[in-house]
Amino acid sequence: IGFQFIVSIVLIISAMFVRQQNRFMQKYSLGFDKDQVVVVELNRNIMHDHKDSYVGGLKEYPGIEDVAFSVYELSKEDDMIDLEYARHEDKDVFFKVFYASENFLSVMDIQVEEGRDFTREDLNKAQSDYIINPAAERDFHLHPGDRFNDRTVLGVSKDFRFNSCRIASSPFVFALNNDIPNPKLVSYIRFNSKTNLQEAVAHVRETLKEIDPTF
């Protein structure tokens, strides 16, 4: 068999593999709704001094439903989520913590299947309670109302991908950033389904420029 023929076969197989991967990624469910959400990384100036102006300016556009925040971007990097440990059932256990605003799950359409979601009243607590994922519920034998790491488990979310598809799901909790110094530097802007996305994104850019011309 000629060398060119072998190379052609390899290229055809590679192309088929890439198409299958693309098809899989298009159909693969992350467990949250990213289609109507625009993610914007902010600088500290906006978050520290102009957060209310930022949210208020965005909501002047009728197609924008809500704005949520987090310390890191969900599902962007496997190693960007805080890893913590706790003493539980007489052993050390490790889990990942994702710090976000109280409306984050609703903006991202991550369902809470047991218990409840965060509310604004939870912001008044000295330290944040948790909403856990199914892996934490399974591995740590936890349920809504249980105590874990000196916090109360408020609810259990629907399963979703917080890291890449190549890594198995592991214990993960959502927490409000009441008790950490890190600012929330990522914003998630949810549009309704009838929004003109091009116009809405232009409004986001204009809002940012009005607050910080250097952005």
Language model segments and positions:
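N-terminal Sec/SRP start-transfer signal
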Residues: 1-6
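Alpha-helical transmembrane segments
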Residues: 7-35
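Membrane-interface junction motifs in transport/secretion proteins
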Residues: 27-51
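Short, hydrophobic beta-strand segments
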Residues: 38-41, 83-89, 187-189
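Structural motif
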Residues: 42-45, 70-71, 133-135
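"Rare, low-scoring activations can occur
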Residues: 49, 55-67, 134-143, 150-215
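Short amphipathic beta-strand/extended segments in non-transmembrane regions
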Residues: 55-118
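Hydrophobic secondary-structure segments that place a key small or acidic residue at a functional site
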Residues: 94-171
